[in-house]
């Protein structure tokens, strides 16, 4: 992750260079000293410097992601994270990760076309690890499908879903040869439930609720909860739907889920005995 923080990387290189220079000066001034233990100590010290800088970069990245996924500050997150799209990242997984997180922030703001454009422009280059390549494409298509679903673009969502299920089948076939404890699970439940709701007006609330409960990120909890609320309303369960929508508005009033929830609340017919708004 240090490649995402050029200043931190530059600082690490400077520290390493200074450290090695000091070791060189010490050996030059103490020619009688045995160089082997000095170099061993230097290697340990150098490793500590490098590891500490990598850990710092990792923590900085985690804090940035927390702003988006748990603090729900999409605008602040993008202000600091979006410029990383311009970094010359050689590691394909890191480059994709940056795009996935950025696209999630775009979606949180309702900027689905920009999210789709960002993800569609990324080509997974073949590597020696075919499974990793499929995993990368699976992540991209899953997000693209979700964007299309939130735009209510059924043809695109169905096309992405078909590709997603095909990728899932290939990945599961690869996992079949591995010990059971080492097998990965590839979930398409959220995409399937959302598409089912758009196509048929029905979705399994129980499945969606389990996805909310198993998710640790507040942003995703809220986004899934919006779908649950829509299902409740379609089932004429106004009480639960209204309750959930009010919670979403309270938690994320400035984000896309909160704004949609507010619109749905405003569009509800007045209850018996109440004056229309």
Language-model regions, residue ranges each:
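N-terminal topogenic membrane-targeting module
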Residues: 50-128
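Helix-turn-helix repeat elements of alpha-solenoid scaffolds
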Residues: 34-40, 66-82, 107-122, 154-167, ...
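N-terminal alpha-helical membrane-insertion module
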Residues: 1-78, 84-86
